[in-house]
């Protein structure tokens, strides 16, 4: 019988038994026996961990202490054979590209993972593939130095021209005779109860929660969003009214030497909400999004002056906020995989 060498995925870095990355090396049988606790392929105990068949190939692949046929060691996504390296997570093996696509940092537009050596675009805290960095209305790619607007809720991007057209059209509708205004929305008692229960859970629900509420109540997404905005504004107004009534009551009823902030020597007992009531905090950085036709997607929340647009500049580290032009990075943005470590000689440099 032919002699066998063992092709082993040797020392593996492991984190919480979830993710490991290994590299392969060709060892002689004697070297392999001194480093791993597994039988030689000539031995009856050499069994492939995937197909449960004896390994009689010239080379044997070892991953995390387990033996495999070289033909069985494949990426669970693309089914290609794994060569020099592989990634292991939850007993599934992946090639480098598909591991990062599935478990790496996600593109804010397509929600797919980004491979570390790919060039990316960055706006605020959001990262995009270069091909995904485009206006979601006209689908035109945004170039370096171009002004654009960022929607806070879902990280969508809008070029300056489309935003200004939508804003101007909306302003013209508001200045009209009112004949084109939408009818007032009526919410049924059952739908109202559903919205109230959701409000008790969170006064500022995430987008996917609003989508679920819209599906359950049969209301438009925009209607659900406006209902939550109005509810927060109402509670804020009630809170201010309660404060004014407290001061008035204090002046009328307190005849003791207690402080102004108390009545009959006792501190006021207010119930404060544990979340900010200012609706301005929950608006988009530059505008609100609408769920109707594209030309109604935005409404300028500042009646006096328009907020300054964000700018894409030459590649640089983002240091601006939303009151100043937003920079755009075209640097190679290496993103490490979540909960993973690499062996020292395979460690990429992360920026």
Curated annotation (Swiss-Prot):
Location of this chain's protein in the cell: Nucleus
Expressing tissues:
Expressed in the anterior AFDL/R sensory neurons and BDUL/R and ALA interneurons, and in PVT, PVQL/R, DVC, PVNL/R, PVWL/R, PVR, PHCL/R, PHAL/R and PHBL/R cells in the tail region.
Question: Residue ranges of the DNA-binding region?
Answer: 180-239
UniProt domain LIM zinc-binding: residue ranges: 46-105, 105-169
Protein's name according to its UniProt entry: LIM/homeobox protein ceh-14
Which Gene3D superfamilies does its entry note? Answer: Cysteine Rich Protein, Homeodomain-like
| Gene deletion effect | RNAi-mediated knockdown causes severe defects in the ALA neuron in young adults. RNAi-mediated knockdown abolishes expression of helix-loop-helix protein mbr-1 in the interneuron DVC.
Segments spanning the bilayer are none
Residue stretches of biased makeup (Basic and acidic residues)? 238-254
One cellular component term (GO) for this entry is: nucleus
Name the source organism. Answer: Caenorhabditis elegans
Q: Which InterPro entries does the UniProt entry name for this protein?
A: HD (IPR001356), Homeobox_CS (IPR017970), Homeodomain-like_sf (IPR009057), Lhx3/4-like_LIM2 (IPR049594), LIM_Homeobox_TF (IPR050453), Znf_LIM (IPR001781)
What keywords would UniProt list here?
A: Developmental protein, Differentiation, DNA-binding, Homeobox, LIM domain, Metal-binding, Neurogenesis, Nucleus, Repeat, Zinc
> Which GO molecular-function terms appear in the entry?
DNA-binding transcription activator activity, RNA polymerase II-specific; DNA-binding transcription factor activity, RNA polymerase II-specific; RNA polymerase II transcription regulatory region sequence-specific DNA binding; zinc ion binding
């Amino acid at each position: 019988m032919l002699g066998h060498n063992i092709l082993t995925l040797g020392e593996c870095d492991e984190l919480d038994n979830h993710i490991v990355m290994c590299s392969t090396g060709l060892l002689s049988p004697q070297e392999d026996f001194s480093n791993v606790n597994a039988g030689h392929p000539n031995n009856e105990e050499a069994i492939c961990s995937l197909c449960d068949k004896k390994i009689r190939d010239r080379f044997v692949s070892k991953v995390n202490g387990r033996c495999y046929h070289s033909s069985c060691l494949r990426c669970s996504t693309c089914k290609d054979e794994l060569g020099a390296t592989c990634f292991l997570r939850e007993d599934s093996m992946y090639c480098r590209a598909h591991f990062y696509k599935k478990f790496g940092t996600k593109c804010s537009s397509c929600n797919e993972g980004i491979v570390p050596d790919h060039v990316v675009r960055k706006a605020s805290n959001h990262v995009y593939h270069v091909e995904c960095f485009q206006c979601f209305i006209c689908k035109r790619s945004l170039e370096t130095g171009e002004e654009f607007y960022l929607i806070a809720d879902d990280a969508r991007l809008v070029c300056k021209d489309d935003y200004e057209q939508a804003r101007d059209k909306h302003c013209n509708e508001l200045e009209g005779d009112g004949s084109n205004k939408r009818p007032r929305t009526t919410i049924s008692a059952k739908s109202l109860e559903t919205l109230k229960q959701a409000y008790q859970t969170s006064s500022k629900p995430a987008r996917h929660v609003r989508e679920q509420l819209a599906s359950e109540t049969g209301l438009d997404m925009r209607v659900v969003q406006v209902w939550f905005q109005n509810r927060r504004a109402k509670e804020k107004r009630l809170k201010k009214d309660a404060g004014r009534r407290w001061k008035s009551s204090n002046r009328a009823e307190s005849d003791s030497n207690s402080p102004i902030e108390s009545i009959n020597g006792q501190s006021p007992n207010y119930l404060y909400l544990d979340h900010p009531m200012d609706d301005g905090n929950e608006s988009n950085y530059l505008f609100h999004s609408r769920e109707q036709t594209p030309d109604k997607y935005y409404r300028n929340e500042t009646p006096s002056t328009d907020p300054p647009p964000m700018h894409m500049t030459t590649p640089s580290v983002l240091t601006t906020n939303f009151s100043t032009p937003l920079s755009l990075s075209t640097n190679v943005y290496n993103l490490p995989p979540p909960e993973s470590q690499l062996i020292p000689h395979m460690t990429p440099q992360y920026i």
